[in-house]
Amino acid sequence: MNAPTQDLPYFQNPKHERNFLLLLAAMQFTHVVDFMILMPMGPLLMKTMSLTPAAFGSMVSAYTFSAGIAGILSAIFLDRFERKKAMLVVYMGFILGTLLCALAPNAHLLLLARIVCGGFGGVMVALVFALIGDAIPMARRGAAMGLVMTAFSVASIAGVPLGLYLSNHFGWKMPFVALTVGSLLMWFVALRLLPRMRRPALITGALADFGAILGKPIHWRAFAFTFAMMGSTFMVIPYISSYFVANSNVANDELPWLFFAGGLFTFFTLRWFGALGDRHGLFRVFAWISLAAVGPVLLLTHFGAWGLYAAIAMTVVFMVLVSGRSAPGMALLTTVVEPRLRGGFMSLNTAMQQIASGAGSFAAGLIIVEGAGGRFERYGLVGWLAAAGILASIWLGAGLGETKK
């Protein structure tokens, strides 16, 4: 991997640096909402398009598979282009993919549109992190990453509930229309405010030293750790909304409250879990949270007709613990690779996250069936498999060699 020759601040004015990061966070927000919105719209889409759970799972997994593959392929050529030009082209492709979702007349074309969105979205995420690496000195890079990553929590708190409101009142296409308009506005803001990288771009996402990365058994264990962690999560998440509506007396227009409450709590707990990992050891905290998450996973996937308030409480506990594993878990991964290989390793690991998410949702879709009256059956079996994946991630994480950060 080419090492940077200097680590000087790109922005001389701290205000300009913060505006740059807020712009990236806003662009990331549109991508996260686009990725997340399909899952809580499951009940509406399955009814409107007569989708089986397997067909819906394919639609969710198509996005993540496409993002994973595109993320790997883009690492080969992305660093040959000036960052701003590359981001504007890729973001426009993402916008067009979102527009295709809004225009899709049937499930087959919606599936193709999701593949387009996922492909451009996966490259866009790589570019966001590359821009941060190019423009922000190492001393402030962690805080910069944290600011941009808040897009995930904000998407859960505001973006997904608003999208569900639009879909419940104006049809499933309206969230994609709103996203297209909002993203197009962000494109023009980026055209004006996103700076050109005047110095050579750092190779933050290229598959440099590819053979060295794949030649180390510890790296393969780390990839398996990521697959178990993300695959177990996405066996459950895409079907929560559909399960609550079909089996638990939760109405479609009540679903936004689940995501608002879950996102609000995770906005605070994610940082807290990360701090616990720094204080008590990354693997130790990851193992604690993972063991604590097994119970909520099993309870949620065997949830009875207990109504809205019980569903909100269960969703909050589930989201806090399942997402809470990611803070110490992802930090743990950075300890297994030497610095000169870290860029390529993390690029491959990000692609593995996407592929594992797609594999988890696709596998669960093959297991779940609709019973009498549209009720979900065998979601409990999915819960047991997800619990096994969580336990497997603990075993795999124990072999990564970190005991105290």
Which residue ranges define each predicted feature?
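Helix-breaking motifs and short loop linkers at transmembrane-helix boundaries and internal kinks
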Residues: 50, 82, 103-109, 303-305
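Conserved MFS/SLC helix-loop-helix module at the cytosolic interface between two early adjacent transmembrane helices
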Residues: 69-105
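Helix-loop-helix hairpin linking two adjacent transmembrane segments in secondary transporters
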Residues: 138, 147-194
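C-terminal transmembrane helical hairpin of 12-TM major facilitator-type secondary transporters
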Residues: 283-329
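Juxtamembrane intracellular "pre-TM" segments in multi-pass secondary transporters
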Residues: 5-14, 195-225
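Cytoplasmic helix-loop-helix junction between adjacent transmembrane helices
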Residues: 113-151
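Extracytoplasmic gate region of multi-pass secondary transporters
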Residues: 38-39, 219-260
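A membrane-interface helix-boundary motif in multi-pass transporters
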Residues: 168-180, 368-388
